């Protein structure tokens, strides 16, 4: 039989062996520096608004994605195109455009009131539903089919 001191010394080891505690690194190790347009503007292109493409290897490590050097080389032109496109978007002058909630509307335009409607042919609609359990409509599973 174990003494209390011996049992106390063994129990933490058993707990660690049966259920390891995962040590998560601090958030700072995922992103050594914040990713933003201001941190990725090259000094030479600061006036032109061009963005520097991110380091794919560092991003892949941060996202816990394995990326071979060949894959990184293949993705580099594609990422550069996306970054260039965002650089073009940053160069667009938006000062003369009024802000709106959605395209074609303004902040003072009114949308219809969101309120429930009753349908005259509700019974016909319910009869057409193959699997109806009042008040729910049962549909086939879409995600996680097994």
Curated annotation (Swiss-Prot):
Gene3D superfamilies: Glu-tRNAGln amidotransferase C subunit, N-terminal domain. Pfam families: GatC. Its EC number is 6.3.5.-. One of its GO terms (biological process) is regulation of translational fidelity. GO terms for cellular component: chloroplast; glutamyl-tRNA(Gln) amidotransferase complex; mitochondrion. It is found in: Mitochondrion; Plastid, Chloroplast. Keywords: ATP-binding, Chloroplast, Ligase, Mitochondrion, Nucleotide-binding, Plastid, Protein biosynthesis. The keyword Protein transport does not apply. Residues 28-53 are annotated as: Disordered. Its main location: mitochondrion. It comes from the Eukaryota. GO terms for molecular function: ATP binding; glutaminyl-tRNA synthase (glutamine-hydrolyzing) activity. It is an enzyme of class 6 (ligase). It catalyses: L-glutamyl-tRNA(Gln) + L-glutamine + ATP + H2O = L-glutaminyl-tRNA(Gln) + L-glutamate + ADP + phosphate + H(+). The keyword Nucleotide-binding applies. Subunit of the heterotrimeric GatCAB amidotransferase (AdT) complex, composed of A, B and C subunits. Belongs to the GatC family. PANTHER family: GLUTAMYL-TRNA(GLN) AMIDOTRANSFERASE SUBUNIT C, MITOCHONDRIAL (PTHR15004:SF0). This protein may be expected to contain an N-terminal transit peptide but none has been predicted. Allows the formation of correctly charged Gln-tRNA(Gln) through the transamidation of misacylated Glu-tRNA(Gln) in chloroplasts and mitochondria. The reaction takes place in the presence of glutamine and ATP through an activated gamma-phospho-Glu-tRNA(Gln). This is Glutamyl-tRNA(Gln) amidotransferase subunit C, chloroplastic/mitochondrial. The lineage of its organism: Eukaryota, Viridiplantae, Streptophyta, Embryophyta, Tracheophyta.
